[in-house]
Every structure is written in C-alpha cells, then in structure tokens.
Design a protein with these regions (language model features):
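A short, exposed loop/beta-hairpin motif centered on an aromatic-Gly-Thr core
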Residues: 27-38
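Short, charged, surface-exposed hinge/linker loops at domain edges
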Residues: 1-6, 42-74
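Short aromatic-glycine-(Arg/Gly/Cys) micro-motifs in beta-strand/loop hairpins
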Residues: 10-26
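Short glycine/serine/threonine-biased micro-segments
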Residues: 24, 31, 56
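Acidic-residue sensor for enzyme active/binding pockets
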Residues: 24, 38, 48
Length: 74
C-alpha cells in the first residue's frame, strides 16, 4: 500500500532504539525498532493498519502534510 504520510524516525539514547512518530495520526501514534530498517517497516505496517481501519469504519483519512517548497538539486 502506498501512502503519502509523514514518518519521522529518530534515535533515542534513553530507549536505545529508533523511535517513530506518525504526526498526521495524532500525538500518540508511535512505534519503534532496534534498527532504522525495522523502525521503518514497523511504521509502514502501522500506517497500513490505521488506513485500513479508517476505511473499514468509513472514517475520513487525515490529510497528508505537504512539504511547503520545491526541492532544489545542487
């Protein structure tokens, strides 16, 4: 499933893992992984569950956050 939602991945020294935030889905939508790849895979799985659940309940999906400007290549 392709989605255009934001996935923020940061290393946590306190937790010794990568912590993931999915900001369009609220303040409490997080997951984690011991590696960056695992954190990303977990985030994609959570997003798929959130999207499927909302669609099954006929609930609107939150709008994706858009990057506010064009990228320029160096």
């Amino acid at each position: 499933m392709t989605s255009h939602y934001t996935i923020l991945i940061q290393w946590s020294e306190d937790d010794q893992c990568y912590v993931v935030s999915l900001p369009e889905w609220g303040d409490f939508c997080h997951t984690h992984g011991t590696t960056y790849a695992e954190a990303l895979a977990n985030a994609q799985a959570v997003l798929e569950l959130l999207i499927t659940s909302a669609q099954d309940k006929n609930e609107p999906l939150p709008p994706p956050q858009l990057f506010g400007r064009s990228l320029q290549m160096a």
